[in-house]
Amino acid sequence: MPLMKFKPTSPGRRSAVRVVTPDLHKGAPHAALLDSQSKSGGRNHHGRITVRHVGGGHKQHYRIIDFKRNKEGIPARVERIEYDPNRTAHIALLCYVDGERRYIIAPKGLKAGDQVIAGANAPIKTGNALPLRNIPVGTTVHGIELKPGKGAQIARAAGAAVQLVAREGIYATLRLRSGEMRKVPVECRATIGEVGNDEHNLEKLGKAGAKRRRGVRPTVRGAAMNANDHPHGGGEAKAGQGNPHPVTPWGVPTKGYKTRKNKRTQQFIVRDRRG
């Protein structure tokens, strides 16, 4: 998809870069697959901020996505490719031969009129979903389950892709884009191909207001705060952080410090993403 730049009629337009998407559906989404969602503004049930830089933004309906791909052996036709405000990837509306419609994450190259199917004996073709035990080693996949039947959890964002590099016993080894090598049960399902809208990372919003419409609030530097608000705060004039290692507002080191605590699944990581 080509990139579109604008005439510098304003500072925001001067900096903006957009991805041209002529194949996206221009009408309303499928109403039966919409759900309402309310915004929390990053607050918990006590009203205290638990996630910073969240708040405001445009209202959106949630699109109910079929992450499980459990409608086995029934072919479906891609009715259209749609924009989804809740994720970076586009979504595809499938119409099954029995009349049911479902949304899936749109793989790269999938277009309206294509046919996809899910099942253990599905052909190795973009958009088809099948267990890792039936996918050839070396194949690029996305939308991978971590537990059989739980639904896709890995590689769902725009341009995401994972390579199946080995299969031994009850586990398959995957190479993630981060460089991490991870073992996943071979009964877990994955979708062939990589996620579409892979040029999303080349977009530039151009102005702060575009970020605010997405519900993202400003990030203030710790050094610009008062001493009671941040470890880097305080001091006379433009004082530095006064700390040999930058830290979060709660004193946790921010650069190179490992914060992963889930030892239960550490056994499945063959190689760390840091090499």
From Swiss-Prot:
Could you name the Gene Ontology cellular component terms for this entry?
A: cytosolic large ribosomal subunit
Q: What keywords appear on the UniProt entry?
A: Ribonucleoprotein, Ribosomal protein, RNA-binding, rRNA-binding
Keyword RNA-binding in annotation: yes
Q: Which domain of life is it from?
A: Bacteria
- What GO molecular function annotations does the UniProt record carry, in alphabetical order? RNA binding; rRNA binding; structural constituent of ribosome; transferase activity
Looking up SMART domains in the UniProt record yields: Ribosomal_L2, Ribosomal_L2_C
Does the record bear RNA-binding in its keywords? yes
- Region named Disordered: 223-275
Q: Name one GO biological process term.
A: cytoplasmic translation
Per the record, the coiled-coil ranges are none
How is this protein organized at the quaternary level?
Part of the 50S ribosomal subunit. Forms a bridge to the 30S subunit in the 70S ribosome.
Family (UniProt)? Belongs to the universal ribosomal protein uL2 family.
NCBIfam families found in the cross-reference section:
rplB_bact
Tell me the function of this protein: One of the primary rRNA binding proteins. Required for association of the 30S and 50S subunits to form the 70S ribosome, for tRNA binding and peptide bond formation. It has been suggested to have peptidyltransferase activity; this is somewhat controversial. Makes several contacts with the 16S rRNA in the 70S ribosome.
Record-given protein name: Large ribosomal subunit protein uL2
Look up and give the organism this protein is from.
Answer: Xanthomonas campestris pv. campestris (strain ATCC 33913 / DSM 3586 / NCPPB 528 / LMG 568 / P 25)
Question: Taxonomically, what lineage is the organism?
Answer: Bacteria, Pseudomonadati, Pseudomonadota, Gammaproteobacteria, Lysobacterales
Give me the gene this protein comes from.
Answer: rplB
